[in-house]
């Protein structure tokens, strides 16, 4: 018998359920999910789009998103300018995430597999690698913040902050995250409800202590950009990068829905969950950044809190990073499978966890956290925006009609193209990345066009999406129409 068949036989369904999530023997809560990238068969489909609300709310209403909002104030924006950037960036990014979620019910597979239709099965490898690096990198970025908080907690307990404490903190943080993600989809979705409930209580506690001290007329510090508009666009880009960094995850959490699930419902619930989390965390983050230097948030923020709230504050950081990384690890595991690494899904999660542990150790001992975070945000935006544009325009051109089995058929089929590569699409993606880099302004790369001609404005998000989307529409429109006519 095939190992998956034996696993299906011995799998024990969860004895308890979370409201809104159906018990399923192929995807049980606190049991090993048996599916990897293979299309979810109709008999294993389950769930409701409202699950997406809790998934994205639980995964994003946390300290790491709060820190993202704080970057807008660190860039020199006033409080109200920063809040406007949070609203505009949050709405725009959440719309894109919602749209990218519709593939799940149609194809029953992970997001990164769906772009095989545009790139070809072999041509999809470069973007699959980008997606995997993005997810794995976010595991490390979040883990670094959690490790710093755990080290502070160890100091409170009188254990010091020596090398042994740091290594133990890394191990505890990564093992806890991997333990949840390796179970699979149902466990991840169910756990995010719990993550949100605890995070909300702790984060709103921070807000209660901060509100009486807020200077609502805060005018901002020294601007990072050379013009007010350029500075605001820089802040907008950072907020937009948050939801955009999840678009390669979107269908991973909607793929178990039934094939006839309305697309509007999928879009709405994913959009709402991401938007609410971004706005709530954005409000708290911008307010706190006007009161304390957030360049080192774990060390500086406790200065404005009562002494007794230090431990709950540190738990906010650890808990939120875990909630975020459970999603990251699950998708990174699927991403590794998309690179044709022939291991079970749970083993892929463990492998990603090991790699992230190494990256976290490097960051904890040798690198400034906020520099790492800002650079990773900008790189994520530049590499994923062009890919997201191709994903969405391809959906529009095909009217959402995909051959789910052909997405996994090597050597033949409508998505095989020439030796499995659709070279025009790869060229469009490369052009989109170049267009984004050409007008980027970040700690990673500041283009001469941005600094000299645009007043420091970072237009990489607009350039990456618009240029790539238009080019792909022009290049692929006729190709897809011709293929449809032959079918």
Feature roles, as predicted:
Residues 128, 156-183, 197-208, 235-248, ...:
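Transmembrane alpha-helical segments of multi-pass small-molecule transport proteins
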Residues 74-76, 102, 118, 126, ...:
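Membrane-water interface regions at transmembrane-helix termini and the short interhelical loops
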Residues 85-119, 129-143, 477-479:
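Juxtamembrane transmembrane-helix boundary signature
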Residues 39, 387-471, 485:
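C-terminal membrane-solvent junction of multi-pass transporters and transport-like membrane proteins
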Residues 148-151, 198-222, 239-244, 284-291, ...:
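Hydrophobic alpha-helical segments and their helix-loop junctions in multi-pass secondary transporters
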Residues 2-79, 230-236, 255-263, 479-487:
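Membrane-interface "cap" regions at the ends of multi-pass membrane proteins
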Residues 49-66, 207-214, 223-288, 307-326, ...:
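Hydrophobic, membrane-embedded alpha-helices of multi-pass small-molecule transporters
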């Amino acid at each position: 018998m095939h190992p998956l068949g034996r696993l299906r036989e011995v799998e024990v369904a969860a004895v308890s359920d979370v409201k809104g999530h159906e018990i399923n023997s192929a995807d049980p809560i606190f049991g090993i999910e048996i599916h990897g990238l293979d299309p979810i068969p109709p008999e294993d489909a389950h769930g409701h789009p409202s699950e997406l609300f809790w998934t994205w709310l639980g995964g994003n209403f946390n300290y790491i998103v709060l820190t993202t909002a704080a970057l807008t104030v660190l860039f020199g924006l006033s409080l109200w300018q920063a809040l406007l950037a949070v609203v505009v960036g949050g709405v725009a990014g959440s719309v894109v995430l919602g749209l990218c979620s519709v593939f799940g019910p149609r194809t029953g597979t992970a997001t990164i597999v769906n772009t095989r239709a545009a790139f070809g099965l072999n041509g999809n490898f470069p973007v699959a690698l980008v997606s995997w690096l993005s997810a794995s990198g976010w595991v490390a970025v979040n883990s670094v913040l959690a490790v710093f908080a755990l080290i502070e907690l160890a100091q409170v307990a009188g254990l010091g902050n020596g090398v042994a404490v740091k290594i133990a903190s890394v191990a505890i943080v990564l093992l806890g995250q991997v333990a949840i993600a390796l179970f699979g989809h149902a466990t991840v979705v169910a756990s995010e409800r719990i993550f949100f409930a605890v995070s909300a209580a702790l984060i709103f506690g921070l807000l209660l202590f901060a509100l009486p001290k807020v200077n609502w007329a805060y005018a901002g510090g020294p601007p990072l950009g050379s013009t007010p508009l350029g500075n605001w666009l820089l802040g907008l880009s950072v907020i937009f990068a948050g939801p955009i960094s999840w678009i390669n995850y979107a269908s991973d959490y909607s793929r178990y829905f039934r094939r006839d699930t309305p697309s509007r419902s999928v879009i709405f619930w994913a959009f709402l969950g991401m938007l609410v989390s971004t706005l709530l965390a954005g409000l708290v983050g911008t307010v706190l950044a006007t009161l304390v230097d957030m360049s080192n948030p774990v060390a500086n923020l406790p200065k404005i809190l009562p002494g007794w709230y230090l431990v709950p504050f540190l738990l906010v950081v650890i808990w939120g990073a875990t909630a975020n990384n459970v999603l990251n690890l699950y998708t990174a595991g699927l991403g590794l499978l998309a690179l044709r690494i022939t291991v079970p899904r749970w083993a892929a999660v463990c492998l990603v966890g090991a790699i992230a542990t190494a990256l976290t150790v490097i960051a904890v001992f040798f690198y400034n956290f906020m520099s790492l975070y800002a650079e990773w945000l900008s790189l994520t935006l530049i590499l994923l925006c062009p890919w997201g544009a191709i994903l969405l325009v391809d959906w529009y051109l095909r009217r959402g009609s995909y051959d789910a089995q052909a997405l996994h058929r090597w050597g033949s089929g409508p998505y095989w193209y020439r030796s499995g590569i659709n070279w025009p699409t790869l060229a469009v993606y490369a052009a989109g990345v170049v267009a984004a880099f050409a007008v980027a302004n970040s700690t990673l790369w500041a283009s001469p066009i941005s600094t000299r001609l645009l007043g420091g404005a970072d237009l990489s998000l607009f350039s990456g999406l618009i240029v790539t989307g238009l080019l792909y529409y022009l290049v692929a429109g006729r190709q897809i129409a011709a293929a449809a006519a032959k079918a």
